[in-house]
Swiss-Prot record:
Record keywords: Cell cycle, Cell division, Septation
Alphabetical list of InterPro entries matching this protein: SpoVG (IPR007170), SpoVG_sf (IPR036751)
Record function comment: Could be involved in septation.
Species, as recorded: Thermoanaerobacter pseudethanolicus (strain ATCC 33223 / 39E)
Keyword Cell cycle recorded: yes
GO BP terms, alphabetized: division septum assembly; sporulation resulting in formation of a cellular spore
Family: Belongs to the SpoVG family.
Protein name: Putative septation protein SpoVG
Phylogenetic placement of the source organism: Bacteria, Bacillati, Bacillota, Clostridia, Thermoanaerobacterales
């Protein structure tokens, strides 16, 4: 499965959630609401999730192996950095 598009839909400077992203695979399937989060060890992605009645968050869709997760995270963070640079350039 190839990542064919990454769209950074919302950028936040405040708080730990830095962006909301949509990713398209093979120009046929899209996953919305992937979050870019700033953690203690840097940026990471959080897949779309829902809250259970017990208060736990369960992923709705997620990679099932670490290689795919790493490729997805790399592609998202690359586009996030581009979007941040473009936003900074517009502010100048």
């Amino acid at each position: 499965m190839e990542i064919t598009d990454v769209r950074v839909r919302k950028l936040n400077e405040e708080g730990k959630m830095k962006a909301v992203v949509s990713v398209t695979f093979d120009n046929e399937f899209v996953v919305h609401d992937i979050k870019v989060i700033e953690g203690q060890n840097g940026l990471f992605i959080a897949m779309p999730s829902r809250k259970t009645p017990e208060g736990e968050f369960k992923d709705i869709a997620h990679p099932i192996n670490s290689d795919t997760r790493n490729r997805l995270q790399s592609a998202i963070l690359k586009e996030y950095e581009k979007a941040k640079e473009q936003e900074a350039a517009h502010k100048e």
